[in-house]
Amino acid sequence: MATLSNHNQLDLSNGSHPEEYKIAALVFYSCIFLIGLFVNVTALWVFSCTTKKRTTVTIYMMNVALLDLVFILSLPFRMFYYAKGEWPFGEYFCHILGALVVFYPSLALWLLAFISADRYMAIVQPKYAKELKNTGKAVLACGGVWVMTLTTTVPLLLLYEDPDKASSPATCLKISDITHLKAVNVLNFTRLIFFFLIPLFIMIGCYVVIIHSLLRGQTSKLKPKVKEKSIRIIMTLLLQVLVCFVPFHICFAVLMLQGQENSYSPWGAFTTFLMNLSTCLDVVLYYIVSKQFQARVISVMLYRNYLRSVRRKSVRSGSLRSLSNMNSEML
């Protein structure tokens, strides 16, 4: 026990991950990869190929699914690293995946803010309902926020301070530890303002006005289905932001202000897990927004039930055949 404790302390002092974290990360990321890949591939296919009447919220959902897929496709490299304990994919690719940890929540929050503003227009400003069908503006908004986020993330590829330099065997601590980003704290806190606080305040502002309008009965002209759908979207977005993104960014700010050297942070690891969970929780949004996605999920579930029933029947028929054969042999 003493040897294990000393080994873990040595790992933490060197900035590497304890074995418990690696095992938990392997299990967690495996589940996220399998569920998230199926959910977001299905969503992207539904929104881009089977949805005939596209609206602004459809465009936003396509971008959410695409962003989730980009992030999810990086998970197998993480899992390989945690399983093998070394990084064979090169230093530059490690930088890219490390930057992706910051890129994903930054862009995701803006996309969720766009969806919140879209629901604000649908409930509080129904006279501008035609704007909700103007997909051109939605495409420009999404393209602009993609470019803006990429531009502010590129400097992370050029960091001088690198926790993985001169490591043997090669490591890639950047994909889970964000403490090495202290070297660019000015950029970090600028990013916190523009990619966390501003979209968060936009969402809160939209929700406050929407709730105020609902309580004062200013939305009586809206169809009940539109109200119900919008409220479900709002509640889902609020829960997702509070669970997945707020803890991550609070931890990010705290770690950037701490004066200690780079080391493994259990709180940082946990909030990073929560942030990754967002790629799967988006399924609730997809299910609420799109009837086609609902139908697709239901068809998959029915098909699985059908396969199970076929297997049960085949097992039963096989057991009956074997029983009849035994009886014939006895006779």
Curated annotation (Swiss-Prot):
The keyword Membrane applies. The chain crosses the membrane at residues 27-47, 57-77, 96-116, 139-159, 192-212, 237-257, 269-289. Coiled coil: none annotated. The modification Phosphoserine is found at residue 322. Residues 1-26, 78-95, 160-191, 258-268 are extracellular. Glycans are attached at residues 14, 188. Disruption phenotype: No visible phenotype. However, reduced number of CD8alphaalpha gammadeltaT IELs has been reported. In addition, GPR18-deficient mice display impaired resolution of infections and diminished responses with RvD2. Its main location: membrane. One of its GO terms (molecular function) is G protein-coupled receptor activity. It is found in: Cell membrane; Cytoplasmic vesicle membrane. It holds the Pfam family 7tm_1. GO terms for biological process: CD8-positive, alpha-beta intraepithelial T cell differentiation; CD8-positive, gamma-delta intraepithelial T cell differentiation; negative regulation of leukocyte chemotaxis; negative regulation of tumor necrosis factor production. InterPro entries: GPCR_Rhodpsn (IPR000276), GPCR_Rhodpsn_7TM (IPR017452), GPR18 (IPR028335). Keywords: Cell membrane, Cytoplasmic vesicle, Disulfide bond, G-protein coupled receptor, Glycoprotein, Membrane, Phosphoprotein, Receptor, Transducer, Transmembrane, Transmembrane helix. Expressed in the eye including cornea, retina, iris and ciliary epithelium (at protein level). Expressed in spleen, liver and lymphocytes with highest expression levels in intestinal intraepithelial lymphocytes. It is a multi-pass membrane protein. GO terms for cellular component: cytoplasmic vesicle membrane; plasma membrane. Residues 48-56, 117-138, 213-236, 290-331 are cytoplasmic. Disulfide bonds join 94-172. Belongs to the G-protein coupled receptor 1 family. G protein-coupled receptor (GPCR) that plays a role in diverse physiological processes particularly within the immune and nervous systems. Becomes active when triggered by various endogenous ligands including endocannabinoid N-arachidonyl glycine (NAGly), delta-9-tetrahydrocannabinol or resolvin D2/RvD2 derived from the omega-3 fatty acid docosahexaenoic acid (DHA). Upon RvD2 binding, facilitates the resolution of inflammation, aiding in tissue repair and homeostasis. PANTHER family: G-PROTEIN COUPLED RECEPTOR, N-ARACHIDONYL GLYCINE RECEPTOR. This is N-arachidonyl glycine receptor. The gene is Gpr18.
